[in-house]
């Protein structure tokens, strides 16, 4: 089964975690990483069975699919690290892909997938 790691614990990241908690999201969440560790940990503490908080590097290592929910400015670095590890990326901030076409080339070269929800 595909496991997901979430980068970002704002409105979208929290919605995904809540969906997982009530069973609406059936893929296992291996962890979460965020630029705002303190607030992310505070939110995780409100969940009954929270995933582990971890560094972005740890998250990528233990997840099959990385879900970016942190804003477009993290996409270039996150995509690079994700694709270097041979993992796939779901970019919630799809506009960043237009601003950084090299990300598409990198995914192609590494045979990784980019999912862009609409």
What are these regions (language model features)?
Residues 23-44:
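NAD(P)-binding Rossmann-fold cofactor-contacting core
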Residues 80, 93-113:
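Rossmann-fold NAD(P)-binding glycine/threonine-rich loop
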Residues 118:
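Anionic-ligand binding region
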Residues 40, 75-76, 99-101:
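Short, well-ordered alpha-helical microsegments
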Residues 5-16:
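Glycine-rich adenosine-cofactor-binding loop
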Residues 53-65, 69, 73-94:
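Rossmann-fold NAD(P) dinucleotide-binding segment
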Residues 1-3:
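Residues that mark the start of a beta-strand
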């Amino acid at each position: 089964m595909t496991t997901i790691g979430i980068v970002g614990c704002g409105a979208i990241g929290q919605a995904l975690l809540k969906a997982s908690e009530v069973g609406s999201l059936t893929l296992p969440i291996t962890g979460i990483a965020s630029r705002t560790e303190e607030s992310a940990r505070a939110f995780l503490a409100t969940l009954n069975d929270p995933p582990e908080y971890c560094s972005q590097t740890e998250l990528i290592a233990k997840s099959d699919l990385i879900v970016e929910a942190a804003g477009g400015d993290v996409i270039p670095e996150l995509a690079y690290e994700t694709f270097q590890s041979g993992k796939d990326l779901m970019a919630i901030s799809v506009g960043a892909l237009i601003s950084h076409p090299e990300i598409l080339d990198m995914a192609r070269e590494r045979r990784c997938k980019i999912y862009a929800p609409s």
